[in-house]
From Swiss-Prot:
Organism: Salmo salar (Atlantic salmon)
Gene behind this protein: hoxa7
Record's subcellular location: Nucleus
Regions that span the bilayer: none
Database matches in Gene3D superfamilies: Homeodomain-like (1.10.10.60)
Keywords recorded for this protein, A-Z: Developmental protein, DNA-binding, Homeobox, Nucleus, Transcription, Transcription regulation
PROSITE patterns named among the record's database cross-references: HOMEOBOX_1 (PS00027), HOMEOBOX_2 (PS50071)
InterPro entries (UniProt xref): Antp_homeobox, HD, HD_metazoa, Homeobox_CS, Homeodomain-like_sf
GO molecular function: DNA-binding transcription factor activity, RNA polymerase II-specific; RNA polymerase II cis-regulatory region sequence-specific DNA binding
Protein name (Swiss-Prot/TrEMBL): Homeobox protein Hox-A7
Recorded family membership: Belongs to the Antp homeobox family.
GO terms for biological process, alphabetical: anterior/posterior pattern specification
DNA-binding region: 1-60
GO cellular component: nucleus
Length: 75
């Protein structure tokens, strides 16, 4: 059963981003609350956060590797 990709409204995206800014991981309780407020399923919230964490990791990958390099070069 293949699902089409979900498109989120501007409001939903904004709220999810705001939540992510404060917390990269959600408790089940918080996920239920957000799902209710944004009229999304828990599954959609869970997957949005998983995808967002991957994007965050990718965006911050270079920063951590470059700071590691400078720390190593001092030895």
């Amino acid at each position: 059963r293949k699902r089409g990709s979900q498109t989120y409204t501007r409001y939903q995206t904004l709220e999810l981003e705001k939540e992510f800014h404060f917390n990269r991981y959600l408790t089940r309780r918080r996920r239920v609350e957000i799902a209710h407020v944004l009229c999304l399923t828990e599954r959609q919230i869970k997957i949005w956060f998983q995808n967002r964490r991957m994007k965050w990791k990718k965006d911050h990958k270079d920063e951590s590797s470059s700071s590691n390099l400078s720390a190593n070069s001092e030895n």
